[in-house]
Regions:
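TPR-adjacent "capping" and linker segments in tetratricopeptide-repeat scaffold/adaptor proteins
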Residues: 1-18
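Register position in tetratricopeptide repeats
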Residues: 28, 62, 96, 130, ...
């Protein structure tokens, strides 16, 4: 129940202190739509309160409304320009709005405030990937791996970016670490690409087969994903004419095992 919509209570709860108290209660409980209404009313009276705009932005973000969230966070930034939390939220909004260049500029600002924040480093890497600057992305993923060598957070992006820039042995090393840990279908799929590009056909087929098995035997999905990655495979040096030959061997083996 939104207490302000109860006609008897509305006059009693319309002062700023009551609005803020109720808004904070809704916010902490995760009732973001109700909290948003209250914080927006408060913002009309408190133009210089960055926390109100932060919470308005967060409520919009929880609704998936990144444009309005961004607008609120930018207002908070004007009031408090070096707030790490706000800067990260602005960057997140830009990423979700498919504006990696703008996101990157804010993540770099966040990086200056907290140089060893792993999440910021990862997101900088992701922004470079979205701009297809894989070499630059690798620098940040390697920094994450250096700061947290046992965490494995950056292994997958390091492996994939290494493959895309032609560092196949490096990609292979990282996929071996991933496959020794807790691999999912996509890990075997991508590791198969690396082995295929290195000319290790039997190993590639084995990895592709494992990928299909872990995806509930969905060979149609596998073929669709393989076709989507064909340009990257060709860029890695695989001849287009070799792809149908490998796929025939793979599918024959799968059919034969049924």
């Amino acid at each position: 129940i939104n207490l302000l919509h109860v006609s008897v209570l509305n006059p009693l709860l319309s002062d700023s202190d009551s609005l803020r108290l109720i808004g904070e209660y809704y916010f902490r409980r995760g009732y973001y739509a109700e909290a948003l209404e209250l914080f927006e009313r408060l913002s009309a009276a408190y133009h210089s309160d960055s926390e109100i705009y932060q919470k308005i932005g967060f409520c919009y973000q929880k609704k998936g409304d990144y444009a309005n969230a961004l607008e609120a966070f930018l207002k908070a930034e004007i009031i408090s320009p070096d707030n790490f939390w706000t800067i990260r939220r602005i960057a997140t909004c830009y990423r979700n709005m498919k504006k990696p260049e703008m996101a990157l500029s804010y993540y770099h600002r966040a990086e200056k405030i907290q140089p060893e924040n792993l999440s910021v480093q990862m997101n900088i890497g992701h922004c470079y990937v979205e701009q297809k600057d894989y070499e630059e992305a690798l620098k940040y993923y390697f920094k994450v791996d250096y700061l947290d060598p046992e965490g494995g957070k950056a292994w997958r992006p390091i492996a994939w970016c290494s493959f895309l820039v032609g560092k196949k042995e490096q990609a292979q090393r990282y996929y071996e670490k991933i496959l020794d840990d807790k691999p999912v279908s996509l890990d075997y799929f991508n590791a198969g690409h690396v082995e295929f590009s290195l000319g290790h056909i039997r190993k590639a087929i084995d990895y592709y087969r494992r990928s299909i098995e872990l995806d509930n035997g969905d060979s149609a999905k596998f073929l669709s994903n393989f076709k989507q990655d064909a340009p990257d495979l060709i860029s890695s040096g695989i001849a287009a004419s070799d792809m149908p030959i490998l796929l025939d061997q793979l599918m024959y083996g799968i059919t034969d095992s049924l």
